[in-house]
C-alpha cells in the first residue's frame, strides 16, 4: 500500500438534503450546502416523485477534495437523485480525495440513488464511503459504478489507489458491510473480485422478495444470454445474491453503456414490481 498524503488543500464540499411528503408530492423542504456541491430545483416528471440532479460544478475531483453528501427521506416521501454525468477523480501528486455519502430513509419512505459512474484516472488517490440507514418499511434502490482507468482510450489504471466501504443497515441492524481495495493494475488483474475487468458495479435493492428476485434473475439471463449483441465483445459478468432481505447485484465489465443499460433495466422493473408501473427515466441520461 503506497503512502498517502491525507492533508487537504482542495475543495471542501458538503450538502444535506431533506425530503418530506407534502400533499401528493415530495418536496425538498430543507437544504444545507458548503462549497461547490449543489442541486437543481427538483422537478416532477411523474406524480409524487421528486427528481433531483446533484451537481459538482468544477467538473471533477482532485487530490485533497472532500465531498460529503447527506440525503434524508422522511415518511412517505419519494425522491430520485442522479448526476448529469460521470464523477471524475483526477490524477493526484499524493493528496487523497474523498467522497462520503450518508443516505437515510424513514418508514414508508422511498429513495432511488442512481448516480452515473465514477471514473478513476491513473494515479488518482481516492476514498469512498457510503452509509445507508433504512427503516424496515422503507424502500431503497441504489447503485455505484466504478471505472478504473479509461478503457475506451486504452488507458489502464497502472498506478493509483482507491478504497471503498459500504454499510447498509435496517433498523440499526447491519445487513451488509463490504470494502473495496484497488491498488494499481495488479489488483485489477489478480483480485478475486475483479477478474481483469476495469469496471465494477453494485446495485442494492431493499426490500427483497422471492418474486422480485426471480424476476430480476430472469431479466439478467435474458439480457446476457438472449441479447448478447447488447454487450458487443465485452463479455461482462453479472450475478445476484440475497442477503437478509437485501438484493445485491454485481457487475463486471469493460464498458459503461452496457452496465448502465443493465442496471437501468433492473431498476425500472423493480419499480414496476413495487408500484405497478415503469418509472420515467431521467432525461439527463440520454444527453
UniProtKB/Swiss-Prot annotation:
Main subcellular localisation: cytoplasm
Source organism (scientific name): Aliivibrio fischeri (strain MJ11) (Vibrio fischeri)
Subcellular location: Cytoplasm
Domain of life: Bacteria
Gene that specifies this protein: ureD
Gene Ontology CC terms: cytoplasm
Protein name per Swiss-Prot or TrEMBL: Urease accessory protein UreD
The UniProt record lists the keyword Lipid biosynthesis: no
Function: Required for maturation of urease via the functional incorporation of the urease nickel metallocenter.
Recorded family membership: Belongs to the UreD family.
Subunit composition and interactions: UreD, UreF and UreG form a complex that acts as a GTP-hydrolysis-dependent molecular chaperone, activating the urease apoprotein by helping to assemble the nickel containing metallocenter of UreC. The UreE protein probably delivers the nickel.
A GO molecular-function annotation: nickel cation binding
InterPro entries named in the record: UreD
UniProtKB keywords: Chaperone, Cytoplasm, Nickel insertion
UniProt keyword Ribonucleoprotein present: no
